[in-house]
Amino acid sequence: MSSGGLLLLLGLLTLWAELTPVSSRDRPKFCYLPAEPGECNAYMPSFYYDSASNKCKKFIYGGCRGNANNFKTRDECHHTCVASGKGIQPRIGSN
């Protein structure tokens, strides 16, 4: 196979990996943890995955402790934890 063909194949595989949705069995276990604001008093708008609604929701993180179900953007939460059996998940905004 030519180097151009290999490059095309690599590009297609990369695109496929980016667009493939997370299935519930592939979802990291920390996605099932509840929102945990932590013990400190900072005001850091963050997002957590709510497994009951299969959506990322906003919460206020206090800045320390907490758990791994804590994302700076909705987009990061969505691509890590949201699952759908209906095909490709579109990218969403960060707010």
From Swiss-Prot:
Its main location: secreted. Keywords: Disulfide bond, Protease inhibitor, Secreted, Serine protease inhibitor, Signal. One of its GO terms (molecular function) is serine-type endopeptidase inhibitor activity. Residues 92-95 form a propeptide. Pfam families: Kunitz_BPTI (PF00014). The record marks N41, A42 as: Reactive bond. It is found in: Secreted. Disulfide bonds join C31-C81, C40-C64, C56-C77. Expressed by the venom gland. Residues 1-24 form the signal peptide. One of its GO terms (cellular component) is extracellular space. Residues 31-81 form the BPTI/Kunitz inhibitor domain. Belongs to the venom Kunitz-type family. Serine protease inhibitor. This is Kunitz-type serine protease inhibitor ki-VN. It comes from Vipera nikolskii (Nikolsky's adder).
